[in-house]
From Swiss-Prot:
It is found in: Cell membrane. This is Undecaprenyl-diphosphatase. One of its GO terms (cellular component) is plasma membrane. Keywords: Antibiotic resistance, Cell membrane, Cell shape, Cell wall biogenesis/degradation, Hydrolase, Membrane, Peptidoglycan synthesis, Transmembrane, Transmembrane helix. Bacitracin is thought to be involved in the inhibition of peptidoglycan synthesis by sequestering undecaprenyl diphosphate, thereby reducing the pool of lipid carrier available. The keyword Nucleotide-binding does not apply. Belongs to the UppP family. It is a multi-pass membrane protein. Catalyzes the dephosphorylation of undecaprenyl diphosphate (UPP). Confers resistance to bacitracin. It catalyses: di-trans,octa-cis-undecaprenyl diphosphate + H2O = di-trans,octa-cis-undecaprenyl phosphate + phosphate + H(+). It comes from the Bacteria. One of its GO terms (molecular function) is undecaprenyl-diphosphatase activity. Pfam families: BacA.
């Protein structure tokens, strides 16, 4: 990989990871349109470590509070607060993507990054996001979450394994369909992503150096710089996005997704870019 590609894709990763627009889809599209080759699922997974560190830093107080409450409630039934249960919901909600990710890891790294699929997913899932915004009651608080909610949002997170869907788009939409407030759905989705993304990134480190079957190799220095850039840009993006959701809906991103997906389909049909 060239340093220009590393910098551009890392900035793009940081900007899009927390927005409902699909960071993996954007990286796959940008790689083919501007660099004529896919950086690969392994590079994407490793660069996501930077954005997940950004989530850890941004939610540090929340995470510490949840961990303390979880351990306290584990040994003292009388101290089982909402944060204690939230800790359990994050653990339970991580199970679906762990299972699906292991079962379909080869498909995710190769066939799922076909630009026809990416562009189609970008467009189709836009309507799911719009429906979630339209039908969501936005009445439920964190104290009202149950294990069923965590399983459903966890299953929705599995959809993000398909580039073009969007992890935040899928989890926030699921939360809205379940009646959660928009900001709660976003925060819960971001917390839910931490274990899965860290596991995926660490698991993909060897393949980022020597990709198997697709993608280009990256040096250790390039991967380190990628993680740092994604962290800095990602921290700014998550802070902005959560403030944005307080007063605005995700409709703003629906139109963008449809336009981008359509443009990619046109470029593919015209033979301007390669699908794989």
């Amino acid at each position: 990989m060239s340093w220009l590609q590393v910098v551009v894709l890392s900035v793009l990763q940081g900007l899009t990871e927390f927005l409902p627009v699909s960071s993996s889809g954007h990286l796959a599209i940008a790689s083919r349109v501007f660099f004529e080759d896919d950086a690969g699922a392994s590079f994407t997974a490793v660069s996501q470590l930077g954005t997940e560190v950004a989530v850890l830093v941004y939610f540090a107080r929340d995470i510490v509070r949840i961990v303390k409450a979880w351990f306290a409630g584990l040994f003292r039934a009388g101290q089982r607060s909402a944060d204690y249960w939230l800790g359990w919901w994050v653990i339970i909600g991580t199970i679906p993507i762990s299972v699906v990710g292991l079962l379909f890891k080869d498909e995710i790294r190769t066939g799922a990054r076909n630009l026809w699929l990416v562009a189609t997913a970008m467009i189709v899932f836009s309507f799911v996001i719009a429906a979630a915004e339209y039908y969501g009651r936005q009445a439920r608080r964190v104290e009202q979450l149950t294990w069923r909610d965590s399983i459903i949002v966890g299953l929705a997170q599995c959809l993000a394994l398909v580039p073009g869907v969007s992890r935040s788009g899928a989890t926030i939409s699921a939360g809205l369909f379940l009646g959660m407030h928009r900001e709660l759905a976003a925060r819960f989705g971001f917390l839910l992503a931490i274990p899965a993304v860290f596991a995926s990134g660490l698991f993909s480190l060897p393949d980022a150096f020597e990709p198997v079957g697709e993608g280009m190799s990256a040096s250790g220095a390039q991967l380190f710089v990628s993680i740092v850039i994604a962290f800095v840009v990602g921290y700014a993006a998550v802070a902005w996005f959560l403030r944005f959701l307080v007063r605005h809906s995700m409709y703003w991103f629906v139109g963008y997704r449809i336009v981008l997906g359509t443009v990619v389909l046109v470029l593919l049909s015209a033979g301007v870019v390669s699908a794989i």
